[in-house]
Amino acid sequence: MNLVIDIGNTKVKAAVFELDTIKVAYVFDEVNFFEELEYILEKHEITHCILSSVKETREDYLQELQKIPFFILLDATTKVPLKNLYSTPTTLGIDRIALAAAAVSLYPQKNSLIIDAGTCITYDFINLKSEYLGGAISPGIDVRYQSLHHY
Protein backbone atom coordinates (compact mmCIF):
# COMPACT_ATOMS: atom_id res chain seq x y z
CA MET A 1 0.00 0.00 0.00
CA ASN A 2 1.02 3.61 -0.53
CA LEU A 3 1.26 6.29 2.15
CA VAL A 4 0.99 9.96 1.22
CA ILE A 5 1.89 12.51 3.91
CA ASP A 6 1.45 16.28 3.71
CA ILE A 7 2.84 18.46 6.49
CA GLY A 8 0.97 21.74 6.28
CA ASN A 9 1.09 24.99 8.21
CA THR A 10 -1.44 23.79 10.78
CA LYS A 11 -1.98 20.03 10.46
CA VAL A 12 -0.43 16.87 9.09
CA LYS A 13 -2.61 14.99 6.62
CA ALA A 14 -1.91 11.39 5.67
CA ALA A 15 -3.73 8.90 3.46
CA VAL A 16 -3.25 5.22 2.78
CA PHE A 17 -3.90 4.22 -0.82
CA GLU A 18 -4.39 0.90 -2.53
CA LEU A 19 -3.82 1.65 -6.21
CA ASP A 20 -6.00 4.74 -6.84
CA THR A 21 -8.33 4.23 -3.89
CA ILE A 22 -7.97 5.95 -0.53
CA LYS A 23 -8.44 3.29 2.13
CA VAL A 24 -8.18 5.64 5.12
CA ALA A 25 -7.20 9.24 5.82
CA TYR A 26 -5.70 10.77 8.94
CA VAL A 27 -5.41 14.35 10.18
CA PHE A 28 -3.28 15.12 13.22
CA ASP A 29 -1.06 17.69 14.92
CA GLU A 30 2.61 17.58 13.98
CA VAL A 31 3.57 17.12 17.64
CA ASN A 32 2.06 13.60 17.32
CA PHE A 33 3.95 12.74 14.10
CA PHE A 34 5.89 9.72 15.39
CA GLU A 35 2.97 8.20 17.31
CA GLU A 36 0.63 8.57 14.33
CA LEU A 37 3.23 7.23 11.89
CA GLU A 38 3.86 4.21 14.10
CA TYR A 39 0.10 3.54 14.27
CA ILE A 40 -0.28 3.81 10.49
CA LEU A 41 2.70 1.53 9.80
CA GLU A 42 1.46 -1.09 12.27
CA LYS A 43 -2.05 -1.06 10.83
CA HIS A 44 -1.14 -1.11 7.11
CA GLU A 45 1.49 -2.84 4.98
CA ILE A 46 3.11 0.28 3.55
CA THR A 47 5.58 -0.32 0.70
CA HIS A 48 5.70 3.17 -0.83
CA CYS A 49 5.62 6.62 0.74
CA ILE A 50 5.83 10.22 -0.44
CA LEU A 51 6.16 13.22 1.86
CA SER A 52 5.55 16.87 1.12
CA SER A 53 6.01 19.65 3.62
CA VAL A 54 5.52 23.41 3.50
CA LYS A 55 8.22 23.63 6.18
CA GLU A 56 11.80 22.43 6.22
CA THR A 57 11.54 18.69 6.76
CA ARG A 58 12.97 17.48 10.03
CA GLU A 59 15.88 15.06 9.72
CA ASP A 60 14.36 12.65 12.26
CA TYR A 61 11.19 12.42 10.12
CA LEU A 62 13.29 11.54 7.08
CA GLN A 63 15.27 8.91 8.98
CA GLU A 64 12.07 7.20 10.10
CA LEU A 65 10.37 7.39 6.69
CA GLN A 66 13.44 6.07 4.86
CA LYS A 67 12.81 2.73 6.58
CA ILE A 68 9.88 2.30 4.17
CA PRO A 69 11.10 0.30 1.12
CA PHE A 70 10.35 3.05 -1.42
CA PHE A 71 10.36 6.62 -0.07
CA ILE A 72 10.27 9.94 -1.92
CA LEU A 73 10.63 13.41 -0.44
CA LEU A 74 8.73 15.74 -2.76
CA ASP A 75 10.85 18.84 -3.27
CA ALA A 76 11.76 21.33 -5.99
CA THR A 77 14.01 18.74 -7.68
CA THR A 78 11.37 15.98 -7.89
CA LYS A 79 10.26 15.26 -11.46
CA VAL A 80 6.57 16.14 -11.88
CA PRO A 81 4.35 16.00 -15.00
CA LEU A 82 4.33 19.75 -15.67
CA LYS A 83 6.57 22.59 -16.74
CA ASN A 84 6.94 25.24 -14.04
CA LEU A 85 6.87 28.71 -15.63
CA TYR A 86 6.60 30.51 -12.28
CA SER A 87 8.95 33.51 -12.23
CA THR A 88 10.74 32.28 -9.07
CA PRO A 89 10.24 28.49 -9.16
CA THR A 90 12.33 27.75 -6.06
CA THR A 91 9.99 29.88 -3.93
CA LEU A 92 6.83 28.07 -4.99
CA GLY A 93 5.46 26.02 -2.10
CA ILE A 94 5.80 22.28 -2.49
CA ASP A 95 2.13 21.87 -1.54
CA ARG A 96 1.19 23.95 -4.57
CA ILE A 97 3.47 21.89 -6.83
CA ALA A 98 1.82 18.70 -5.53
CA LEU A 99 -1.65 20.06 -6.28
CA ALA A 100 -0.58 21.20 -9.75
CA ALA A 101 0.89 17.76 -10.50
CA ALA A 102 -2.34 16.13 -9.35
CA ALA A 103 -4.42 18.43 -11.57
CA VAL A 104 -2.29 17.59 -14.62
CA SER A 105 -2.61 13.87 -13.86
CA LEU A 106 -6.37 13.98 -13.25
CA TYR A 107 -7.24 16.44 -16.05
CA PRO A 108 -4.64 16.00 -18.82
CA GLN A 109 -4.63 18.56 -21.63
CA LYS A 110 -7.14 20.80 -19.86
CA ASN A 111 -6.87 24.27 -18.37
CA SER A 112 -7.14 23.93 -14.59
CA LEU A 113 -7.67 26.40 -11.79
CA ILE A 114 -6.78 24.85 -8.45
CA ILE A 115 -8.18 26.43 -5.28
CA ASP A 116 -6.93 25.12 -1.94
CA ALA A 117 -8.54 26.48 1.23
CA GLY A 118 -6.36 25.70 4.23
CA THR A 119 -4.47 27.98 6.60
CA CYS A 120 -4.03 30.08 3.46
CA ILE A 121 -6.10 30.07 0.30
CA THR A 122 -4.09 29.44 -2.84
CA TYR A 123 -5.13 29.79 -6.46
CA ASP A 124 -2.97 28.16 -9.15
CA PHE A 125 -3.40 27.90 -12.91
CA ILE A 126 -2.18 25.17 -15.26
CA ASN A 127 -2.82 25.49 -18.98
CA LEU A 128 -3.73 22.70 -21.40
CA LYS A 129 -0.04 22.22 -22.26
CA SER A 130 0.67 21.23 -18.63
CA GLU A 131 2.45 24.50 -17.92
CA TYR A 132 2.20 26.04 -14.47
CA LEU A 133 1.60 29.74 -15.09
CA GLY A 134 1.39 31.03 -11.53
CA GLY A 135 -1.17 31.82 -8.94
CA ALA A 136 -1.88 33.76 -5.79
CA ILE A 137 -1.95 33.23 -2.06
CA SER A 138 -4.22 34.97 0.43
CA PRO A 139 -5.29 34.65 4.07
CA GLY A 140 -7.30 31.56 4.90
CA ILE A 141 -10.93 31.33 5.91
CA ASP A 142 -10.24 31.61 9.66
CA VAL A 143 -8.14 34.77 9.27
CA ARG A 144 -10.74 36.30 6.96
CA TYR A 145 -13.50 35.53 9.45
CA GLN A 146 -11.51 37.01 12.34
CA SER A 147 -10.77 40.13 10.28
CA LEU A 148 -14.46 40.70 9.57
CA HIS A 149 -15.21 40.66 13.28
CA HIS A 150 -12.17 42.73 14.24
CA TYR A 151 -12.60 45.67 11.85
Would you name each region that the model predicts?
Residues 1-9, 15, 22-112, 127-151:
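Nucleotide/phosphate-binding catalytic cleft detector across ATP-hydrolyzing
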Residues 115:
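Divalent metal-binding pocket/active-site signature
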Residues 124:
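Catalytic beta-strand/loop module used to bind and position nucleotide/cofactor moieties
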